[in-house]
Regions:
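Short beta-strand micro-motifs enriched in acidic
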Residues: 26-28, 99-103
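Hydrophobic core residues within well-ordered beta-strands of beta-rich domains
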Residues: 32-34, 76-78, 94, 108, ...
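Hydrophobic beta-strand-centered segment that forms part of the acyl-chain substrate-binding groove
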Residues: 63-95, 100
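A conserved, well-ordered hydrophobic junction motif at loop->secondary-structure transitions
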Residues: 35-58
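HotDog/MaoC-like acyl-thioester-processing domains
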Residues: 1, 88-90, 101-160
Length: 160
């Protein structure tokens, strides 16, 4: 599995988010697939004993977003559709896999599945991702970080 980036604040795959899921994925270059193996604990449950649907959607979004790496582009989720086929149990061994369906200009279409250890498909997702300019993204990201830092220091002064 890939190492988590300790500076990445992403809830799904970042190593820099103490409350995040810390999902790690492998790029299967030969088959142009992204694969992750994991277990989701009780902190991610909705109904007792079962994983919350929003968490399932997050896992599918994460694996499908990583598929964009095969095109050497940075893309963001524009649309995500999830089919919940079977309940996902807490502490169950799971495999998530994502692959590309097609591309139309700046738009990428990806698919993902979550399976249990027996190979049963528990959830399936389809996503539409839009390619973005990484330099523009980084500039906006830095501006947001600067604004948040200014707001945070103002909040600290106000509480003093």
């Amino acid at each position: 599995m890939a190492e988590l980036d300790p500076a990445n604040p992403c809830f799904g795959c970042g190593g820099g988010n103490p409350r995040g899921m810390r999902l790690a994925f492998e790029l299967d270059e030969a088959n142009r697939r992204v694969i992750g193996q994991f277990r989701l604990g009780p902190e991610y449950q909705g109904a007792t004993g079962f994983i919350h649907g929003g968490i399932i959607a997050t896992v599918l979004d994460e694996v499908m977003s990583k598929v964009s790496r095969f095109s050497n582009v940075r893309a963001v989720t524009a649309e995500l559709t999830v089919e919940y086929l079977r309940p996902v149990r807490v502490d169950e061994d799971l495999c998530v896999e994502g692959h590309s369906i097609s591309r139309n200009g700046r738009v990428l279409y990806h698919e993902g599945e979550i399976r249990n250890a027996a190979g049963t498909v528990l959830a399936r997702g389809r996503g539409r991702f839009v390619i973005i300019d990484p330099e523009r993204y980084n500039r906006k990201n830095q501006a947001t970080a600067d604004t948040n830092a200014t707001s945070s220091s103002a909040d600290t002064r106000a509480r003093s």
